[in-house]
Amino acid sequence: MKILNKILIGSLSLLCLSSCDFLDETAYNKVTVGNFYTTKDGITNGVNGLYSTLRGMYIQEYLIYMCEGPSDIWIGHQGHEQWYNWTIDATNADVRSFWYSCYKSVNQCNAVIESLENNDIPGLDEDLKTRFLAESLFIRAHYFYHLVQQFGDIPMPLKPTNSVETTAHKTKVDEVWNQIVTDLEFAVENLPETYQASEFGHITKYAAMHHLSRVYLTLKRSDDDLKKALNYAEQVINSGKYSLVKSHAELWDINNKNNSEVLFSVLYTQNAELNGDGNTAHMYFCSAYSEEHPAVKRVIEYGRPWSRERSSDFAISLFDKTKDQRWDDCFISRWNVTENSVTENVFSPFTKKVEEKVWTKGELAMIDPREPWTPEQIKEVWPVLVFLPEYMREQIDPLMDVQSEQNPNAEWPSNTRFTSYKMYAYLVKHLDPLRPEVNWTAGSRNVFVYRLADTYLLAAEAAFLSGNAQKAAEYINVVRRRAAVPGHEAEMEIKSSDVTIDFILDERARELMGEMHRWYDLKRTN
């Protein structure tokens, strides 16, 4: 027995000693950032991957709250009151998501930048290497732009983080802006003017100029900053590479996403295997139209109604609907019957009795004129539901002034309704009619980050602040003529005496509502 025990103990000892070598893993096929970005294919995929990071931001729900929501042109949905009563703190999930997304992407940019700056990559010629570096610096600058606008002093890592770091050091606002300018100026000098069709979506020299114009306009530390803002915007305008499309209806046609007006866009695809979470913005501006009428149900054409952002009464008041085509082109304010046949009992303002109404597919069912109508106007379209501005509810509802079987002689017809946080005319810029079914979340619409109409308005702002109101009016009029109802182009034009910062802000709201600019516009103009 003693001999057996000695043999057993010896065997276990040998096993323990040999197990150390047995458990040591040699990672012959392990891929790390360090070696992946040192090949031509690896660094090419790395740069392309930086564009994919932009999908993590454009347009997620949190970005809407950060860039559009807390402003004069939007009213928020219940459950997101923090954004509209200015009680945001570090526990807010949207803020955390924004912060995490930006810094995760910055770190990815830094890894690519470090590899490009420090490695001789076989097969990668100097021109392509420089272009890759310019693209990477632009995207990093874009994230820093968002971060410094939202938070002021921020951590500004310029090297990749490869291990856990438990402390962070803030960089002063001025230093962050200086780095953004440095990166964007490098991009302007080294990005191409155009790409092959197969590389559509990559950042061009003119996209970088547009971004620099916005940055210098934001800084406006001196007359020289304003001069640079105007110069960069005018270089884009005069390049001959871009032109305004004919109308907003054409601009927002989802089948026209690679149009002549777009300077830079984040790309999505209908291929579900490649689209990831997709573009979900189609849900957030859409009202709950399917909850108001028995014959109107969810359909792809009208969108998936998550009701997150409602345009304010002030925003709607900015549109002269008689001569500004942007109202009809950019908003849904009329809904047709979506069902084949629905029978409803409705109270008639004519007979003062309940009558049977058979709704048929395609006929008009609801209108939100976003302005007061008289009882006579509402009666004329009966039984179509008419949604009056919400403030009118206080004047009418408490008086029981809407007709019904119990109240047949009330002043307001039975088809009178009121807008609410759930039901309203809504923006169509993000709707996605190419989704395979109505509840499909992962949209495929491209996001237009920069477009030429914005460039014209940046140029107008820079010109006005430089003392040239005439030039500002000329640039604004280019945008307004395109926006005119046909035949009203001359009426849409303004004079130099009309130009003020407030007018420019109003025009930016009319033109760019819902495109992730509003809060930065208000912040820039105080």
Where are these regions (language model features)?
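An aromatic- and glycine-enriched ligand-binding surface/loop that stacks and positions planar moieties
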Residues: 21-77, 206-209, 214-393
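C-terminal substrate/ligand-recognition segments
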Residues: 337-342, 346-477
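Short coil/turn linking the two alpha-helices of tandem helical-hairpin repeats
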Residues: 146-149, 153-155, 215-223, 467
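Bacterial Sec-dependent N-terminal signal peptides
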Residues: 1-29
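Conserved, well-structured interaction surfaces
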Residues: 39-40, 44-57, 78-151, 171-178, ...
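Long, intrinsically disordered, low-complexity segments
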Residues: 20-22, 59, 63, 89, ...
